[in-house]
Amino acid sequence: MPNQGEDCYFYFYSTCAKGDSCPFRHCEAALGNETVCTLWQEGRCFRQVCRFRHMEIDKKRSEIPCYWENQPVGCQKLNCAFHHTRSRYVDGLFLPPSKTVLPTVPESQEEEVKTSQLTVQQSKLSVQSNPSPQLRSVMKVESSENVPSPTHPPVVINAADDDEDDDDQFSEEGDESKTPALQPSPDVHNGLRVASARKPGVSLKQGECLNFGIKTLEEIKSKKMKEKSKKQGEGSSGVSSVLQQPQPNPGPEKENVRTVVRMVTLSSKPEEPLVRLSLSERLGKRKLSVGGDSDPPLKRSLAQRLGKKVESPETNIDKAPKKERGHKAGEIHVKTLEEILLERASQKRGELQTKLKAEEPSGADDSPSGTKSSSSVRIKTFSEVLAEKKHRQQEMERQKSKKDTSCLTLTDDTEMKKTVSLPTVAVSKGQPEEPAGRARSMQEVHIKTLEEIKLEKALRVQQSSESSGNSRPQAEAAPGTKRLLRITKRAGVKEEKKCGLEDSGDPPQSSVTKMEANETSDETISDPTKLAVNRCDTVKEKHTQRLQERGASQKEKAALSSVRGDEASSYTRVAGKPVLTAVSGVTRHLAKRLPVESSQKGEVETSGIGDSILNVKCAAQTLEKRSKVKPKVNVKPSVVKVVSAPKLAPKRKAVEMHSAVIAAVKPLSSSSVLQESPTKKAAVAVVPLLSEDKPVTMSETENPKDSSVLSSAQAASEPLLPEGSGPSSSQTATKPRRLSSASTGKPPLSVEDDFEKLIWEISGGKLEAEIDLDPGKDEDDLLLELSEMIDS
């Protein structure tokens, strides 16, 4: 048993249930002894068995009567330190009564009995707790024998304070005696000014009630209610500040509401508005259904359930609570100037929103505001209600179709930013006419918004640019010979971009299939996009007619010498100034239309056509780069950038265009060309193919604008092509990739020599310096640089 350290209180004066696990000292020799060990007090008692107590003893327990002696069982402790008046038997041993005499004062005896009972009860209660709090509790109990219980004095002090508060505020608050003591605490801690501000108002009301009578009190309360409703209505949201502030500390607010209800018991009428007001505030959004004005909120909730996004819910919430509070405060509600202005503003907003139904959020706001204003003015007929329902259904279908088409285009394209711009432009072509007509039929005056004006301007610019783009290529196409646009340094960037866009144009065979694919895809596209695609179809038809007319005259030239001579002559002719000015004008015009053009080019580059063109160009470039001693390969198939082709001579560009067109139209013929190249017949094989497809390439170089518009239309309709056209495009995409990888092996020397000679003859022994384009630059950055160069 532990015999070191301090004594265990329960072992010596009660029963310790811990036994050996008790960290305090259990010593049988010291049982019943009340003498403190002096060595232990000095901290140097190291005896194994010490008969003295290792514990501070403040009381004479021999003078305290034993609690268990008065119990029916009696005291069963052999060494009990308390006073026993009767003799007892413990384990067969006879123990005589205690020799010490108790003090003579009977009152003190009773107190000692009580304290002894307290100690025993506390010892029983805290048997399982740690011994250090045991000692503290014992010391507290022993020291507080003659002191009254600690809970009593604070009660006395609080009562006195309450009495003083009652004396101070009796004239103002009457029965309220305890709320003043509780009121300041929320004011100090939480800053709940609303709660405290409400209370002085109530006290003033009661003071006036005492002085002037009940009628004036009712009038004052009705005025206060009106003021409160105005203040709460002026808040930014329908929920008032009284609701928002008490949330961090709900306790004081509840008590405050209770006091207000108790105050109002003098007059029965104003009690109901107060309670209803707090309930409607706590209900939040549902409070709209509490008032009598329930029809507009129901329609608003229907519009919200149908999935429309409501743009300004706060203002709608504002208006209904104001009406409610007005009806509740008094039977007759006089509208204030602010309310009338707000209603007019809401009606104007509703008119504007009906005209802006092309946009989703405004269209969603339109139905609730319009119905609300009309319901406040007049009752609608049944036919009008039916017309409105049909109108809403049409709007919803239109929005769904828009969302479907935009989602399809977004999922097909890899770069999100570039793809978003084109569908919006295409949609805006057909969109503004229908909603404007509808809005005019509904309301007389049509006020154009800024967005509508911008859309119309963009449409005008686009149409003018398309018409000018059509006229310029026709002017350039007057001479029947094939032209190679060649501009040094400045317009080279734009030319390479145009080459990339022209490659996407197809010869007559593929254009027919593309038109069929466009027609099938038109069925899936919604109304606005049909207009843009149909326009592009008409452009394509004109294009193919022109090609067929020119094809008859151009097929006669089939020899390699004639091709070379034509190219050389056209090269020298193009080096002149008029063509250069025309191209610079085109580029300048393009620079003006940067937002529309860049979005269309982004669409072209990221669509499936772009991939096939790039793969074809890879195949063509690998053939051409054999002629170089140190080829620079800078082609990234994952990111489709037509601009990133390395330095090429003028003839190389022409060859690249021809080979790309051949590969795009006839993958088998291009593969045959590439397979014949190891047998030293590349130059001979290329000639007939070039002569056959010459009208195509010529017309493409002559109408750069048409090809850009056409390719943008193809790119717009490409993600929605049917399954029939899918394999053909994938064929053209996969075959050149394989061929290019195969053809990058060991090139024969004869093919290289042929290319070297051809290029050297055309360039006249001088390869002009070309622009080295940074492949990391974006399409928009290059266009900006081009426009700056042209302006300077």
Swiss-Prot record:
Describe the protein's quaternary organization and the partners it interacts with. Interacts with TREX complex components THOC2, DDX39 and POLDIP3; the interactions are ATP-dependent. Interacts with PABPN1; this interaction retains ZC3H11A in nuclear speckles. Interacts with KPNA3.
Residues the record lists as Phosphoserine modifications:
108, 132, 149, 171, 289, 346
Location within or outside the cell = Nucleus speckle
GO cellular component terms attached to this protein's record: nuclear speck
Stated name of the protein: Zinc finger CCCH domain-containing protein 11A
Q: Name one Pfam family in it.
A: zf-CCCH_3
Q: Where is this region: Disordered?
A: 103-191, 223-331, 345-443, 458-531, 545-571, 690-750
Q: Which GO terms describe its molecular function?
A: zinc ion binding
- Look up and give the organism this protein is from: Mus musculus
The UniProt entry, under PROSITE patterns, shows: ZF_C3H1
Result of knocking out the encoding gene: Homozygous knockout animals show embryonic lethality by 6.5 dpc. Homozygous embryos at expected Mendelian rates are seen at 4.5 dpc. Heterozygous mice do not show any overt phenotype.
The stretches annotated as zinc fingers (C3H1-type) lie at 2-29, 31-57, 60-87
Covalent link Glycyl lysine isopeptide (Lys-Gly) (interchain with G-Cter in SUMO2), residues:
114, 124, 140, 454, 601
**Entry annotated with the keyword Ion transport:** no
Residue spans with biased composition (Polar residues)? 115-135, 461-473, 698-715
Relate the protein's function as given in its record.
Through its association with TREX complex components, may participate in the export and post-transcriptional coordination of selected mRNA transcripts, including those required to maintain the metabolic processes in embryonic cells. Binds RNA.
Basic and acidic residues bias locations = 308-331, 345-360, 393-405, 431-443, 492-501, 545-558
